């Protein structure tokens, strides 16, 4: 089974997300949107469109919960439901929820470091 096919997003906590976004815009040329992040569009498998999101969050965000880590990486996968089932069978910590939105379908897996 094909597992990870790419990176969908990089999300991290910052002391001042707006100022940090401005720094990345001004010094590295990121096209930081009004919502605080940047989108990197690309062509996906078989030419399907895809994107990678870069976005800082406030230090007190609950977005990465239940992880206490200051960052989260979203991976693109070929078949989310099959991968989550395989990871559960392998003894990995897989949260019991998935979400579907216009951005895609999401599941959460905690690596050994949380």
Language model feature labels by segment:
Residues 1-5, 11-54, 89:
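Core segments of cupin and vicinal oxygen chelate
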Residues 1-15, 35, 60-114:
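Vicinal oxygen chelate
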Residues 28-31, 76, 96-99:
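Short linear motifs in intrinsically disordered
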Residues 50-52, 57-64:
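A solvent-exposed interaction/effector surface
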Residues 1, 47, 64-66, 100:
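Sterically constrained small-residue positions within well-ordered secondary structures
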């Amino acid at each position: 089974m094909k597992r990870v096919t790419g990176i969908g997003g990089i999300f991290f906590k910052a002391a001042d997300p707006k100022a940090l976004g401005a720094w990345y815009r001004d010094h590295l040329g990121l096209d930081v949107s009004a919502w605080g992040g940047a989108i990197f569009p690309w062509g996906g498998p078989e030419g399907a469109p895809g994107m990678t999101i870069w976005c800082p969050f406030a230090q007190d965000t609950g977005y990465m919960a239940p992880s206490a880590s200051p960052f989260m990486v979203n991976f693109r996968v070929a078949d989310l439901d099959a991968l989550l089932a395989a990871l559960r069978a392998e003894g990995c910590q897989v949260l019991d929820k998935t979400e579907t939105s216009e951005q895609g379908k999401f599941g959460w897996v905690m690596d050994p470091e949380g």
